[in-house]
């Protein structure tokens, strides 16, 4: 989930109380981030600084090369992606699944560059390349004055998609950090400039308070966070641990739920952002709500199957305790 699991020993941030909520604000960069242990990361960032200034078509080409390299190297993420695709697309032949796995890595390579672009450059120059569908849907929800839950998933264009929408709407996000301190510093600094508040996942009261103050809050609802915070609902026909926070927040706050998806089109170097209202939600049944949300996510994935983060362990927690990976 695009949520704040804060690793206090690695993250150069400070919690701040703002309007009654605990937000994540970046401090000035600690000198320890300049230690030799972090030089490889800084070198990659320096390279990325120049890469994101290339023409978009060359950024896409380079991203595909990076993805192919990661795929050839193999390792744990390749095994996870391969297993996920076998589980979710059993009707594909072995050759088709292998081709899709390769495309997933190519898309992931492009996403790495897109994420670097989001962190290192303003996205204004890309906005003419973005097709928005449903901006009026979100505007209508905001006008109701009950706040809005902007629910997403880990499609490839995650950070860039949020930045595109932030050019049109003021909203907050729930944030999950990386274990890399330098990456955390850069990404959190950028998110603080893009969004109204960057909220810790643990601050549920603050999240509800923001909704009641008519704020829109964005987060991803498609990762396996274990049994404690989940119910089991079908995802591609497989019972998957699915967070129940969306159902609970919608019930407590009365906020409308908007689903956001975002994809790239390599044929013309463009992107699309789609916003759709989730009707008749919540139902009062958390499993039914989770099933509906998974169905929506699955439908969007099927439209662009290579542009989903199949590299994460979506089926890490099983109802019977078995292991898929």
Predicted regions and their residues:
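Short Gly/charged-rich anion-binding patches and loops
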Residues: 46, 80, 136, 160, ...
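N-terminal amphipathic/basic-hydrophobic helices that include classical n-h-c signal peptides
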Residues: 1-28
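Active-site metal-coordination segments of metallo-dependent hydrolases
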Residues: 79, 177-181, 239-243
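Juxtamembrane/interfacial segments around transmembrane helices
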Residues: 115-116, 154-158, 300
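Catalytic core of membrane glycerolipid acyltransferases/transacylases, capturing the structured
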Residues: 144-202, 227-234, 268
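Membrane-anchoring hydrophobic helices of lipid-metabolizing enzymes
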Residues: 21-152, 186-189, 193-195
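Non-catalytic C-terminal accessory region of glycerolipid acyltransferases
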Residues: 25-26, 30-35, 64, 70-73, ...
């Amino acid at each position: 989930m695009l949520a704040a699991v804060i690793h206090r020993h690695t993250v150069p941030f400070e919690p701040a109380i703002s309007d009654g909520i605990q937000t994540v604000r970046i401090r000035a960069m600690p000198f320890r981030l300049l230690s030799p242990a972090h030089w490889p990361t800084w070198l990659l960032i320096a390279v990325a600084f120049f890469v994101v200034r290339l023409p978009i078509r060359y950024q896409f080409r380079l991203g595909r090369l990076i993805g192919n390299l990661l795929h050839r190297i193999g390792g744990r993420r390749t095994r996870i992606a391969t297993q996920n695709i076998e589980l979710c697309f059993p009707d594909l032949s072995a050759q088709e699944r292998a081709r899709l796995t390769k495309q997933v890595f190519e898309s992931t390579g492009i996403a790495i560059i897109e994420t670097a672009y989001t962190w290192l450059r303003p996205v204004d120059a890309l906005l003419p390349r973005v097709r928005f569908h449903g901006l009026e849907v979100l505007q209508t929800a905001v006008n109701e004055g009950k706040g809005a839950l902007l629910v997403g998933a880990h499609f490839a264009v995650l950070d860039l998609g949020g930045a595109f929408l932030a050019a049109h709407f003021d909203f907050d996000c729930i944030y999950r950090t990386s274990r890399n301190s330098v990456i955390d510093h850069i990404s959190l600094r950028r998110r603080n400039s893009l969004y109204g508040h960057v909220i810790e996942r643990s601050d549920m009261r603050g999240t509800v308070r923001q909704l009641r103050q008519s704020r829109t809050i964005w987060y991803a609802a498609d990762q396996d966070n274990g049994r404690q915070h989940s119910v089991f609902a079908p995802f591609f026909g497989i019972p998957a641990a699915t967070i129940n926070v969306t159902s609970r927040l919608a019930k407590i706050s009365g906020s409308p739920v908007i689903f956001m998806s975002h994809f790239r089109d390599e044929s013309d170097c463009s992107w699309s952002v789609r916003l759709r209202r989730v009707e008749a939600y919540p139902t009062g049944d958390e499993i039914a709500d989770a099933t509906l949300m998974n169905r929506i996510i699955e439908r969007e994935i099927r439209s662009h199957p290579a542009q989903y983060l199949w590299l994460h362990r979506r089926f890490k927690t099983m109802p019977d305790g078995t292991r898929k990976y």
